[in-house]
Design a protein with these regions (language model features):
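Membrane-proximal alpha-helical signals and transmembrane carboxylates
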Residues: 1-163
Length: 163
């Protein structure tokens, strides 16, 4: 009787493991994101990753979900170190700061001027990171303080950070 109970317990554990994603996953399918650029135009939110993947939607969460769904592998937005909001998308900053799909320790930037791609901005931002994180921006919002994100400006040969 004990052996039979043990067999059914093992069978149930195996079934649960496969039911809830306990199966093996190929590591080459994992796509960690390091930088995201968020833009808004004509009521549509566009999120572009440094991996060249793009997501679109009517809300920030919908665009981030579309970004993950459109990727050939398993895309992780929670690994993003840098989040850049364009001038047109700055109104999304409070949503970005509280999004469960983004890493609270990610640095926050506001882009002005020309179009900025996540892929091109990544190497600059890694060498010259800003100081404001999403969690600090959220704290400032909760205290009714103005959020002062570093301003990312595209120059003729690269980028520049301003205050």
């Amino acid at each position: 009787m004990r052996k039979l109970a043990g067999f059914f317990a093992a069978l149930a554990a195996l079934a649960l493991a496969f039911r809830f994603g306990g199966g093996a996953q190929d590591v080459s399918e994992l796509v960690p994101v390091q930088a995201l650029v968020i833009d808004a135009q004509n009521g549509e939110i566009t999120v572009t990753a440094d991996t060249q993947d793009v997501g679109r939607g009517g809300s920030l969460d919908a665009a981030l979900s579309d970004l993950r769904a459109g990727c050939a592998g398993t895309l992780f937005t929670q690994t993003a170190e840098h989040v850049v909001l364009t001038q047109k998308a700055w109104f999304l900053m409070p949503q970005v700061c509280v999004s469960a799909q983004l890493r609270p320790a990610a640095k926050l930037y506001r882009a002005v001027g020309q179009e900025i791609t996540a892929e091109r901005a990544l190497s600059f931002l890694q060498a010259h990171p800003g100081e404001l994180t999403l969690s600090r921006a959220r704290a400032a919002l909760l205290e009714n303080k103005e959020v002062q994100a570093a301003v990312l400006v595209k120059t003729g040969g690269g980028f520049r950070l301003g205050g």
